């Protein structure tokens, strides 16, 4: 496969970047496959275009029209999903992984399309009943909801290049607001493929969507009070963006989805070998290995009664040992690589941090087999289970997320202890 150049979509046309930019790689074999750059794009002009062209066109549509528009788009993309699967494989995703991303994303469009039934056939929504604020009803209050007159900027993560885009644009399009989509560059080639089909469909009004495949550094310099910014990614990056002076000055809403230290708790009354115990083990492993653990819903903390700690350890080890790692196109492979070498190095760094206070009891950083691929060329990473026998003292596992097939097993003695451990994840 020759190296292809990703395009950006700005102000109603496809634009080639002024420079070659960043090289993107096949996650399975490490081959260079695309380059991405935003060099030459005028972010301020793109945002004005969205406000002046996309916003009026969407705002004049009723909720019914917007909902039917989303339904038509969902059906259009669903008819073309086979090609999306082909490109998704380059990210290291298995077919099951791609199903979550591609069809899950399209499902979001269908879901928001169906919400039109809860709204009137109008471009605005009157909320609740009028509130009487004076004795003679000469002063009343009533809320009316209308679309913002700005643009939504969606800064997305690398793990769900399709879902991440579609779940967000479904919201802003239904609300009558245009968007600029900024996918994570590492897997932006899959987002670009789907985005091209969206534009080719001619279903959306002009100016509804724009795409930046390369860097979007500086785009927040142009936000205004009617705009909104959404971010999915690391907490560190999110905090920096949230503190941008322009966001603060213009009071721009900033929605952040970042690190998640999700917990799964085995009840005190569950017996090893029971159906509930088996479901627990299966679910932990499934969440560890789906998308190679690159999910915000992945289980990072496994909290179990102290008296069954060893049984859980053994059961997790056995099930993970049967998980074949490799090229997802090869028969029998159940877990592919991480999205790229950069992601692999980041996970290794986080594992090293976690290992300072806890012990690896299942898996290895280096000693594992890969089927149908070279584990050194691809971004492969074996499932890792840590044991933290003192989770109230060694608290790194409640703060550090290794965004891969990594989890920490820890004991508890009472329900109150289990609740306290869950809370230490700070809402995850």
Language model regions located:
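Residue-level detector of anion-binding/catalytic polar loops
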Residues: 178, 360, 428
């Amino acid at each position: 496969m020759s190296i292809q150049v990703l395009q950006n979509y700005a102000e109603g046309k496809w634009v080639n970047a002024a420079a070659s930019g960043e090289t993107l790689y096949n996650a399975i074999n490490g081959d260079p496959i695309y380059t991405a750059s935003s060099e030459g794009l005028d972010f301020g002009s793109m945002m004005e275009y969205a406000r002046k062209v996309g916003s009026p066109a969407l705002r004049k549509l009723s909720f019914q029209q917007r909902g039917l528009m989303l339904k038509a788009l969902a059906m259009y993309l669903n008819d073309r999903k086979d090609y999306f699967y082909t490109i998704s494989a380059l990210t290291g995703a298995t077919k099951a992984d791609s199903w979550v991303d591609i069809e899950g994303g399209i499902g979001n469009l269908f879901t928001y399309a169906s919400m039109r039934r809860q709204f009137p056939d109008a471009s605005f929504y009157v909320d609740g009943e009028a509130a009487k604020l004076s004795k003679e009803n000469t002063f009343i209050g009533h809320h009316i909801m209308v679309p913002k007159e700005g643009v939504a900027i969606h800064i997305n993560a690398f793990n769900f290049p399709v879902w991440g885009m579609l779940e967000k644009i479904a919201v802003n399009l239904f609300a009558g607001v245009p968007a600029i989509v900024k996918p994570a560059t590492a897997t932006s080639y899959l987002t670009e493929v789907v985005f091209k089909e969206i534009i080719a469909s001619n279903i959306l009004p002009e100016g509804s969507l724009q795409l930046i495949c390369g860097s979007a550094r500086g785009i927040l310099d142009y936000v205004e009070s009617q705009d909104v910014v959404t971010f999915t990614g690391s907490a560190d990056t999110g905090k920096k963006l949230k503190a941008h002076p322009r966001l603060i000055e213009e009071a721009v809403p900033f929605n952040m989805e970042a690190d998640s230290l999700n917990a799964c708790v085995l009840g005190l009354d569950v017996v090893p070998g029971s159906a509930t115990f088996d479901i627990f083990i299966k679910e932990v492993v499934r969440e560890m290995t789906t998308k190679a653990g690159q999910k915000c819903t992945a289980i990072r903390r496994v909290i179990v009664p102290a008296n069954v700690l060893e049984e859980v350890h053994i059961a997790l080890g056995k099930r993970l040992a049967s998980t074949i790692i490799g090229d997802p196109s090869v028969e029998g492979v159940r877990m592919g690589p991480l999205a790229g070498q950069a992601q692999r190095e980041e996970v290794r760094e986080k594992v090293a941090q976690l290992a300072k206070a806890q012990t690896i009891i299942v898996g290895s950083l280096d000693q594992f087999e890969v089927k149908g691929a070279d584990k050194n060329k691809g971004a492969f990473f074996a499932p890792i289970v840590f044991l933290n026998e003192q989770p109230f003292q060694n608290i790194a596992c409640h703060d550090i997320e290794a965004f891969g097939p990594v989890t920490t097993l820890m004991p508890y003695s009472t329900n109150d202890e289990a609740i306290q451990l869950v809370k230490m994840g700070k809402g995850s």
